Amino acid sequence: MPPKGKKNRKNDDWDADLGESIAPVNPAAAAPAAAEAPAAAEKEEEAPVGGLMALMRKNKEKRKKKGLSEDWLDGETPEGQAPAAAPEPDLSAKQAEEANLEDEWALPDKKGKKGGKQQQNKKQQQEEKKKDDEEVPEIRVLTKAEKERLKKEREKQRKKEQAAKKKAAGPAQPQKAEPAKPAEEEKKPEEPAPAPAPAPEPAAGGSKKKIPAHLRLIQKQQEELRRRQEEEQRRLEEERRRIEEEERRAEEERKRKEEEKARKKQKEKEKIEQLKREGKYLTKAQREEKARNQRMLEQMRAAGIKIAALEEKNKEEGAAEGEKEKKEKKKPEKKRRPNKVDEQKALEEAAERARQQAEAAAREAEEKARLEREKAEAEEKAKQAAAEESVDEDWEAAAESDKEDVPDSWDAAASDEEKEEEEEEEEEEEKPAPKKTEKKPEPKTEEKKKAEPKKPEAKKEEVKKPEPKKEEPKKAEANGKPATTTLPTRSKEEEKPKAAEAEKKEVAARPKKPVVNKDNLRSPICCILGHVDTGKTKLLDKIRQTNVQEGEAGGITQQIGATYFPVEAIKQKTAVVNKDGKFEFKVPGLLIIDTPGHESFSNLRSRGSSLCNIAILVVDIMHGLEPQTIESLRLLRERKTPFVVALNKIDRLYGWKKIENNGFRESFALQNKAVQNEFRNRLDQVKLQFAEQGFNSELFYENKNFARYVSLVPTSAHTGEGIPDMLKLIVQLCQERMASSLMYLSELQATVLEVKAIEGFGVTIDVILSNGILREGDRIVLCGLEGPIKTNIRALLTPAPMRELRIKGQYIHHKEVKAAQGVKISAPGLEGAIAGSRLLVVGPDDDEEELEEEVESDLQSLFSRVEKTGKGVSVQASTLGSLEALLDFLKDCKIPVANVGIGPVYKRDVMQCGIMLEKAPDYAVMLCFDVKVDKEAQQYADENGIKIFTADIIYHLFDQFTKHMQEQLEKKKEESKMLAVFPCVLNPVAVFNKTNPIVVGVDVVDGQLKLNTPIAAVKMNPTTGQKEIISLGRVTGIERDHKPLQVCKKGQPAVAIKIEMGGHQPAYGRHLDEKDVLYSHISRASIDVLKQFYRDVVTTDEWQLIIKLKSVFDVQ
């Protein structure tokens, strides 16, 4: 069939078009061939018709017209091109043909010259056919040599293209690339290359063949991919080089460090070898031992103990330090001279001046104390030697010689006190007090050994009290037994020597009286009181340079603590306010007792305030007087204890400029006007609050009358300002106004603060010695859990000066301890000792049994609080004071106590508490404050359901127990829910079901109707005339408008109720009428349950209704 769209075609035979389907080898000649097609068709008509020969001739003529040779290798050169360049365009044209043959689908994108789209498609199809026809025979005729030549040409062309690509500066050739290398085509410009290319001539009327868009896109993508691969390869190469460089550097650094470490190790080894050669090398244990010894040495120095071997060294060091200080003083002066003196520098100068004065005062005090001690030692030795020479062996002679200076009887002495005091003063002038010799234990000499047998007698004379004359013969008899032979019958002759001996003892005791004088004062005991968190312990920490407060549980003091400050330390602290040194210290030191501030520890504050001679009441200047402050004021007023007020936390005043450990007046003068005004305002508020409590108060330096006005000392526990003023004021008041109460008494007074187990000493007791002297070997009696404890003192230990007695540390041993002092006593059998009890010393004439009874009376008063019924909780505490606080709390809560104990909790304590599981399970509880619970005891408690509550802070224990009691209450409430009957009165409206179950509509006339409320009706029996209570059962359902309800109250719309009853239920119409009023069936048990568990829920109107219903149901 002839192709469509061809005009002027006379021969429609399809065979005539066979020649046209064969495309020329050169695609560039396609356009001229297409243009000459009509002319060729006209000549065809004139040619003879001859079948195959005519067809061959026709093809040959066409080739001639196009200027093509029969040989495709030689005839591919287009017209107008040089024949020499024939092979190259021939190859490139062939290559272009091969590229286009693969992509048939892109042909529709090409644009035709003229005509519609269909005509264009037909022409393209014809061209494809021609190409197929031409290529097949041409490819078959290639010889081997031609193929080799073609291959070489292609290789040559490929090399040229690569060389052109490398030349980035020059333009690329416009030759068409092979399909295997589409990316190269993109870079070729349209300009002709030096080599001839098969480009069509514009005169021929044809157009240049374009590369399809999708091929260009693929080429671009391939080029981009190649570029990325190259970049990735370059980046990987750079990364590899960088890693190699880093590894090389790391290796160099490692080697350098190893070399440095080896060098350092070698250097240290050489240093150790050098020290070993010099004999100076110390191991770790030796260094620790040296540091420990140094600390002990410092503590001994702080206590005022001098070591002769170190005195010369200290002098040299002191001289060197003095020179160094002078140089240091000169340096800052030179720097300061040219500068302007501003406020900050004034503060620095004041602080430096205060420090220098304190150091100078401390050195002077130490030197003075040393000279006094040497002088006292020399005098003591001389007196001992004189005393030994003049010792009278005959007691009668001694008694006769002393009789001249003393009154005849104790009664006469008591009646004439003034005369007695004069005699004492005369005796004091004649001979110094022997007590002074007991301040420091001296090394034993031969003379001292001779005087030792007199010690028991001296002790006996100190402890002995004046007694009525009735007991004198008995005591004389008791004391005379070893000296004389006793007869079964008494006679006047026998009584004479006894009376004489009693007289001797009285006279022997008499010379010891001069000890009580104003120059021989004991250390005053000062108690710190105040509200919680006012800074009591922090104030002490600042004075003694410790950190006790932060180590306490919750930062709260819960036990009495004691700290001893020697006079040297007080002098050093007060040097800032005693610059001229005129103030003289007569007391040997100051013992400060720290008491808890919490509400529960009123008993400990009471015990602390009873021990003390003077008190410090700490008040927060920002808050004024608080509840426990007012309670402390009441305690002080009751005991008539003098006190000073520390207005603490002045550093919290806005804008306060601090100077560490300075006097208040100097610091206050440097503050600006606003701070001074604020201080004055707060001071006036505190004064007003004290006036409300009945106390006149004034600033300490403005106070002219200490008897009538309380002194207020502003202090800061953080900066230490005002503390020197406070210490000086306390010592001043003690020496001037309280000398009589600070004189030594022969009677020993001591209180046990705490019982502790100390490694190396066993169980020990902390004791506040407020009067008398304790010695090693003394027989003591104190209160124990299983009765009085009688034992001998094995060791007397005191903490280092200015260290808390409660805190573990290095202890100093003493042969004897003089009041007032906090002392730790080590003795056998102290395991059951009770903290807070009294400690008594058994004298030669004292009866141990009497002392036992006296000591045990403390514990009896405590056990009197224990419930006699045997039902109650068990309480275990660490000290007597804590136990008292717990018992007070439980008494306020109305909780009975069955057992009390002091110390750790063991299995026997838990077993004792387990008895409550049978008697009262709610009280099978142990409250343990600040004690350890044994592992076995805890296990036994868990197995048997006994609750053990432990806490280090007393309020946490209270909270735990309160929570437990609340849980028990809720449990009981749930159990007794069915017994609780809320009162209500119901008026029936309609009966829906008469029985089993009764369903009735009711109005609530009074009270409230709840589910499970028992309902009853009260009727009068017509025959007997008595009340009959008809029980209907319990309300199991309440509905209104078919909606269930839990409760229906008075005044709400009517509801339908269902009443069910197990067994036979009364029926409406037979036992009941619709008009009968219904009531909630109350009883005595239900009323008790309401009172116990629902008292806060039941309203006053409901209680009134219960009273009415009691008469209805005859409840008593």
Curated annotation (Swiss-Prot):
Domain tr-type G as annotated: residue spans: 521-742
UniProt catalytic activity: GTP + H2O = GDP + phosphate + H(+)
Enzyme Commission code: 3.6.5.3
Binding-site residues for K(+), renumbered to this chain: D533, G555
Pfam family of the protein (one): GTP_EFTU
Biased composition (Basic residues): 57-66, 327-338
Gene3D superfamilies reported for this sequence: P-loop containing nucleotide triphosphate hydrolases, Translation factors, Translation initiation factor IF- 2, domain 3
Annotated spans, G5: 716-718
One annotated Gene Ontology cellular component of this protein: mitochondrion
Keywords, alphabetical: Coiled coil, Cytoplasm, GTP-binding, Hydrolase, Initiation factor, Magnesium, Metal-binding, Nucleotide-binding, Protein biosynthesis
Cofactor annotation remark: Binds 1 monovalent cation per monomer in the active site, which can be sodium or potassium. This structural cofactor stabilizes the GTP-bound 'on' state, and may also act as a transition state stabilizer of the hydrolysis reaction.
Primary localization class, coarse: cytoplasm
Biased composition (Pro residues): 192-201
Top-rank lineage group of the source organism: Eukaryota
Biased composition (Acidic residues): 389-399, 407-430
Record-listed GTP binding positions: 533-538, 549, 555-557, 648-651, 717-718
Family the entry assigns: Belongs to the TRAFAC class translation factor GTPase superfamily. Classic translation factor GTPase family. IF-2 subfamily.
Function text: Plays a role in translation initiation. Translational GTPase that catalyzes the joining of the 40S and 60S subunits to form the 80S initiation complex with the initiator methionine-tRNA in the P-site base paired to the start codon. GTP binding and hydrolysis induces conformational changes in the enzyme that renders it active for productive interactions with the ribosome. The release of the enzyme after formation of the initiation complex is a prerequisite to form elongation-competent ribosomes.
Protein name (Swiss-Prot/TrEMBL): Eukaryotic translation initiation factor 5B
